[in-house]
Amino acid sequence: MKGKIQCPALTGMLLAMLIVAVHSASSAEYVPRVEFGARLEPHNRIILGAGQDAASFDSYRRLFDDRHQPLLYMTYVGLCNPVATVVAWGAQVQHELTRLAPYRMVPQIGLNLTGGKDDGSGEDAAIAAGRYDMQIAAFADAVSSFKRPVFLRIGYEFEGSWNNYHPSSFVQAWHRITKVLRDRGLPFASVWCAAGAAAGWLPPEQLMKFYPGDDWVDWWGVDIFSEDEFTRPQLKAFLDAARLHRKPVMIGESTPRYVGVLSGTQSWVRWFAPMLRLLKHCPEIKAICYINWEWKEWSERLGYPWQDWGDARIQCNETVRDRWVKALADPIYLHASGDESVSLPEVQVVGTRR
């Protein structure tokens, strides 16, 4: 066809470069993790998790053998729902955890503080004022019923305009929720999880206005979606700040947005290899959760604008599947296991820290 230049040498060179990039990402060593002594912090390990619904979690975990199951089970609940809805959520999660025995998986809970769907209906001020105390009590009952530790991302993506939280009332709401859970002696670790690039990376001084304080936060967290986020200086600055505050970092949500898995090696080079590089070279990161979704389907189901995010289901591409499963078999990763007891450090419950 006119205007199309055939250049086998160039094509071969580009392919070779891709192969070298993939090999480099997979062969680099993990730097030792920094130890902070936080609640539920593993020693020199990275906890693996997945979600973010029961069927997608099952599809993901079936890719791994019994010794390498994801340890964190992602689940979400809105604190501003009716009490009965919060109770029903707790019962459903308990059912799923029982079904997944003997793996002893640990819930990673996204606790939403809004009254709607990404429409700026933040209820943080009402929570801080005590108007949702019955829901907080019902939520605490649910966490207690799980009889295992949980990670809790209170008001996740707190700086996002779609939530419309206000710094002072968000902090007050965080304190109110955390105090109830701690006073009941529940084995949880709170995760202060930022939206990061999705919210335009607020300047540090603005982001920290949402910070409840070191005594009220156990982990920091950030969500990572698009391929250009891995090398952003703002991400490095966030990780550096977490280290200064002596907090381990959880990647609370991750998915190859706009990349997906269906392009095989290209998908791997664009998103999965950079993610592994980030995990290998950033010793503050001690947990990561992957969203194993076909985003168009869930956009239509739930009514969110995710229709062009792509198919992130690992099982849908052999190249991505095999490389991902192999990469996560590295001993640094902490899995759930069907043939041995895998546990997180004990939580020392000492009441509410002031």
Indicate where each model-derived feature is located:
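Bacterial N-terminal signal peptides
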Residues: 11-21
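N-terminal substrate-binding region of glycoside hydrolase catalytic domains
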Residues: 30-131, 256-259, 289-290
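Substrate-binding cleft of secreted/luminal carbohydrate-active enzymes
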Residues: 44-53, 256-350
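Alpha-helical scaffolding within the catalytic cores
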Residues: 52-63, 87-98, 134-139, 196-212, ...
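Substrate-binding cleft of extracellular glycoside hydrolase catalytic domains
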Residues: 82-196, 311
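Glycoside hydrolase catalytic-domain groove-lining segments
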Residues: 92-108, 215, 219-261
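Conserved, mostly hydrophobic/aromatic
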Residues: 152, 218-220, 288
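Aromatic-lined carbohydrate-recognition surfaces of secreted/lumenal glycan-active proteins
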Residues: 182-204, 248-259, 290
